[in-house]
């Protein structure tokens, strides 16, 4: 957020000042509720909301927002989730994982987080022998558990893997076996130097594909920026233009590279269309998705 805001202001008419306000709580639910229901509609509020909101809206229900009605201005990067396994498992690809006799033990923070959802879905839909242990306070704790042998796998954002455990990737201590999102990244290789498969492409039928698309929505929406519903269209368009200009700004890209930030931009129209498609997932399939996770 800080990096984008620092450069975004240069492209907004009048070059206004930005004040960052953090609003933690409920896994992003508090901030989403504020932006959707309380924040002024005059264009003076810009939000970077949780990428989990589309999935939460369907899987949790009873939320105080509708992601399809937000005014998106763009996405700075995807949150492509990559499933990694520790080198001692001997697993170097998804095919190896399918043949593994010992379960791959994944560390996770909570049952509503992607580091729990992704490996759970891989076990249920792909038939992999996995066990997911939830309760770790965060990524650092799971990484420590990997080093200590408590767990043998973790699903996490590719950007997080690179910034926090890039040395493990280079040394081969962790091996990528799958990626989750709506688009495949050819840069993510398995232990054999091959592109890791996109989970969405492994769906056996249309229903499975729709369910996997729902679970991949957080990766697709990624690090997105939006404005409340009801903001005048002219102001939204101005912000969309400013955001697009920022994403190609040489100073911004150099700053992002210095901070080891992956930039994979998408325009406001793409985000709006994606959010609407996700929210339109048929209720019977949402029910099946909840059942896969063991949610009542």
Language-model segment annotations:
Residues 18-20, 130-132, 263:
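Generic structural signal for residues in well-ordered beta-strands
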Residues 17-33:
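Early extracytoplasmic/lumenal segment of secretory-pathway proteins
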Residues 27, 137-138, 157, 267:
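Short loop/turn segments at beta->alpha junctions
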Residues 1:
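Acidic helix N-cap motif at the loop->helix transition within catalytic regions
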Residues 51-63, 116, 120-125, 153-202:
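A ligand-binding cleft/hinge motif common to bilobed small-molecule-binding domains
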Residues 7-15, 34-45, 54-148, 152, ...:
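Hinge/capping helix and adjacent helix->loop/strand transition within the periplasmic-binding protein
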Residues 170-172, 176-177, 194, 202-204, ...:
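An extracytoplasmic/periplasmic, membrane-proximal ligand-sensing/linker region
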Residues 4, 26-29, 43-56, 75-78, ...:
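Ligand-binding clamshell of periplasmic/extracellular solute-binding protein-like
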């Amino acid at each position: 957020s800080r990096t984008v805001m620092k450069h975004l202001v240069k492209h907004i008419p009048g070059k206004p000042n930005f004040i960052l306000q953090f609003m933690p709580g409920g896994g992003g639910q508090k901030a989403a509720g504020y932006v959707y229901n309380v924040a002024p509609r005059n264009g003076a509020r810009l939000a970077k909301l949780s990428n989990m909101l589309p999935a939460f809206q369907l899987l949790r229900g009873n939320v105080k927002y509708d992601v399809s009605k937000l005014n998106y201005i763009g996405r700075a990067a995807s949150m492509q989730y990559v499933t990694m396994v520790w080198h001692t498992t001997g697993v170097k690809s998804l095919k190896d994982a399918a043949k593994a006799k010992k379960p791959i033990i994944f560390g996770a923070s909570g049952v509503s987080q992607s580091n729990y959802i992704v490996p759970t879905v891989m076990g249920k839909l792909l038939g992999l022998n996995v066990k997911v242990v939830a309760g770790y306070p965060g990524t650092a704790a799971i990484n420590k558990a990997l080093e200590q042998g408590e767990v043998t796998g973790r699903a996490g954002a590719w950007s997080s893997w690179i910034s926090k455990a890039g040395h493990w990737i280079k040394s081969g201590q962790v091996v990528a076996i799958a990626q989750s999102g709506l688009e495949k990244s050819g840069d993510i290789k398995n232990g054999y130097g091959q592109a890791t498969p996109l989970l969405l492409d492994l769906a056996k039928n249309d229903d499975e594909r729709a369910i996997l698309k729902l679970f991949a929505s957080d990766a697709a929406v990624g690090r997105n920026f939006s404005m409340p519903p009801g903001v005048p269209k002219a102001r939204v368009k101005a912000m969309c233009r400013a955001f697009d200009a920022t994403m190609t700004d040489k100073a911004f890209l150099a700053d992002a590279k210095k901070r080891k930030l992956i930039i994979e931009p998408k325009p406001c129209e793409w985000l709006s269309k994606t959010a609407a498609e996700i929210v339109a997932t048929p209720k019977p399939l949402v029910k099946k998705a909840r059942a896969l996770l063991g949610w009542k």
